[in-house]
Amino acid sequence: MQIGSAIGQDKVIMKQVMESASLPVVDYTWFFDNEYLEDKDTILKNIKNVGYPVVVKPATLGSSVGITLVKSEKDIESAIEEAISYDNKIVVEQAIDNLIEVNSSVLGNYEFQRVTPLEEVMGLDEILSYSDKYLGGSKGSKSASKGMASYRYAHLLIVDAIVFRQ
């Protein structure tokens, strides 16, 4: 795996790289599953300091697999358990109001690359699932994206970016 791809695939390392370049990063905390099992109270306190609502994510997966939007403290533990079922490294970040989600897939290597057109997801108030993004399950919104179902080739890297509305 190329170093750029490896860095980009780990959400915690990517945030640290962005911070070191003085780029804005939402407030977040991260932990390993064993740390959560050994000291749940400290982890929950750190999450509370980030401030609700938060997004709980497996740190090294893409395509919205295992991601949960948590609006209040009462739902945080089930969201963490969901994320832990996919990865042993978890990132919890502040949710952003009025965000724009932009999706693109990249297939290839150093000799050949194919990039799908950028896709801005419209008309949704919630985070998209894997099905929403790739199988056309757009949560019932007619203005939402049809997903990337037309790009049925195997993708090696998914690039998900969030652009902030000013």
Predicted regions located by residue number:
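Phosphate-binding site of ATP-dependent enzymes
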Residues: 71-154, 158, 162-165
